[in-house]
Swiss-Prot record:
It holds the Pfam family PsbX. Involved in the binding and/or turnover of quinones at the Q(B) site of photosystem II (PSII). PSII is a light-driven water plastoquinone oxidoreductase, using light energy to abstract electrons from H(2)O, generating a proton gradient subsequently used for ATP formation. Its main location: membrane. GO terms for cellular component: photosystem II; plasma membrane-derived thylakoid membrane. It is a single-pass membrane protein. This is Photosystem II reaction center protein X 1. GO terms for biological process: photosynthesis. PSII is composed of 1 copy each of membrane proteins PsbA, PsbB, PsbC, PsbD, PsbE, PsbF, PsbH, PsbI, PsbJ, PsbK, PsbL, PsbM, PsbT, PsbX, PsbY, PsbZ, Psb30/Ycf12, peripheral proteins PsbO, CyanoQ (PsbQ), PsbU, PsbV and a large number of cofactors. It forms dimeric complexes. Gene3D superfamilies: Single helix bin. The chain crosses the membrane at residues 8-28. The keyword Nuclease does not apply. Belongs to the PsbX family. Type 1 subfamily. It comes from Synechococcus sp. (strain JA-3-3Ab) (Cyanobacteria bacterium Yellowstone A-Prime).
Length: 38
């Protein structure tokens, strides 16, 4: 595996992790908001 390909795969992995954290935070906040409004 070439270094550039390895860097590309790592950037994809980190991008997926960041998106997952953002999505998880949005879902968590929306769930809490719904409970508080009721």
């Amino acid at each position: 595996m070439t270094p550039s390909l390895a860097n590309f795969l790592w950037s994809l992995l980190y991008g997926a992790v960041v998106l997952g954290l953002l999505f998880g935070a949005i879902v968590f906040v929306s769930q809490r908001d719904r409970v508080r409004r009721r």
